[in-house]
Amino acid sequence: MKSERMRIKPMKQRLMIIIGFVLLCLQILKAQEKVNIWQGTACRKNVEMTAYLAKGGSKMAVIVCPGGSYLWHDMNGEGHEVGKWLQNNGISAFVLHYRTAGFMAFFLHYRLLFRGVRYPDALDDLTQATLYIKEHAREYGVCSDSIGAMGFSAGGHLVLSGVTLRQLPLTFVAPIYPVVTMNGKYVHKRSRRALLGDNRKNSRLLRDSLSIEHHISASCPPVFLVNCKDDPIVKYQNSELLDSALTVHNIPHQYIQYKTGGHGFGASDTKGSPECRQWKKEFLVWIRKLQTQ
């Protein structure tokens, strides 16, 4: 009888360990769940957003838009790594896999014949993502009035478009080494072609309408802006154009231009330079100050 009780006790312990492990896995899955932001709407697109929900901390939410010239996404370095970093610092993040033109559009130029993915598709996705988070704020444990957006490279252009062209109700935007202008000698041509489409890339009117530096207004929320002087992909003057426009319109913002770091370092602890990797610490200081204002 005694030996049977001794056998039962370890079995119960193992069962409790298994149950605990299953519950932990469910929590992890919940904290990193994927949703189709267009599900249940008239739009039949499948655009995924991955939630990285913070435990405790602030009730702020940040939509993360990876870069990739509006052709593809750096979903790891500028998406999921960023989401995990924000989550680990008490900020819930939502990594958006917004629509892009794709590799085939880049190589085959098929959009000369077919529409394909182009403006305003990605902006529509960001708009819907913002509305989706607002509608599900209680479920996610975030504040519906405390949603910001962070974008890298072309994703930086996207989040800036959200607050300038759509006046999305975002509390801040953080463009990191962003594409800003669609005109002139500082334009990132690959992003422009991907965004506008092969048939419309030469439209002066459309280029002007999507050049962010021309559309900053008093309704723009606070901005955290970072770039590097040695950026070999997106000319550093893009960020300087944005900084000038924000200054002219008295928009609260912090602009940090590092001498070294290049482009595409995201939230990495190894890419870029030791100097530019300080942007993450600077952002956390900035966002915490913003929350107290």
Residue ranges and their predicted role:
Residues 32-56:
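N-terminal cap/lid segment of alpha/beta-hydrolase-fold proteins
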Residues 40, 178-215:
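Mobile cap/lid helix-loop segments that gate and shape the active-site cleft of serine hydrolases
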Residues 59-67:
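Short beta-strand element of the alpha/beta-hydrolase
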Residues 74-75, 81, 94-144, 271-276:
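Catalytic nucleophile-loop/oxyanion-hole region of alpha/beta-hydrolase
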Residues 106-111, 240-293:
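C-terminal catalytic histidine-bearing segment of alpha/beta-hydrolase fold enzymes
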Residues 128-189, 207:
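Primarily recognizes the serine-hydrolase "nucleophile elbow" in alpha/beta-hydrolase
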Residues 225-227, 231:
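Short beta-strand/loop motif that positions the catalytic acidic residue
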Residues 233-238:
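Conserved alpha/beta-hydrolase "acid-adjacent" motif
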